């Protein structure tokens, strides 16, 4: 998706040129990246737009994780465990309301032991 490429370009080349000033965690660009990865274009655009509007001196700031809606289905009890889950796990879904979850990204690197 072109939006993801534009956001990654901004994070890699433009964002380092200015001081870190985002009032929220995750930063507005990271928030937008997560939204575009997990929602359709229209909803991601609206969520990002309102987040950028909130990122100003009149708002307190703090933690503002993206909220996503997702249906989880019961897994089959006969499955093979994945021993390399750390390598494949990218996001955690923390329950918020009925079928709404906070989206939290896993940011660790696998170390060789």
From Swiss-Prot:
Q: Which InterPro entries match?
A: Membr_insert_effic_factor_YidD (IPR002696)
Principal location listed in the UniProt entry: membrane
Q: Which keywords annotate this record? A: Cell inner membrane, Cell membrane, Membrane
User: What is the protein name for this chain?
Assistant: Putative membrane protein insertion efficiency factor
According to the UniProt record, one GO cellular component term is: plasma membrane
Q: Tell me where it resides.
A: Cell inner membrane
Cite the NCBIfam families for this sequence. Answer: membrane protein insertion efficiency factor YidD
Q: Does the keyword Cell membrane apply?
A: yes
Q: Which SMART domains match?
A: Haemolytic
Instruction: Report the family membership.
Output: Belongs to the UPF0161 family.
Topology of the protein relative to the lipid bilayer = Peripheral membrane protein
Role, per record: Could be involved in insertion of integral membrane proteins into the membrane.
Pfam families per the record? YidD (PF01809)
Superkingdom to which the source organism belongs = Bacteria
């Amino acid at each position: 998706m072109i939006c993801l490429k534009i956001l990654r370009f901004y994070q890699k080349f433009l964002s380092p040129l200015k001081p870190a000033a985002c009032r929220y965690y995750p930063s507005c660009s990271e928030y937008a990246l997560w939204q575009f990865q997990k929602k359709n274009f229209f909803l991601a655009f609206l969520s990002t737009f309102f987040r950028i509007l909130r990122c100003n001196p009149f708002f307190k700031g703090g933690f503002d994780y993206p909220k996503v809606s997702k249906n989880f289905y019961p897994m089959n009890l006969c499955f093979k465990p994945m021993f390399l889950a750390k390598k494949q796990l990218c996001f955690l879904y923390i329950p918020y309301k009925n079928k709404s979850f906070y989206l939290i990204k896993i940011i660790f690197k696998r170390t060789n032991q």
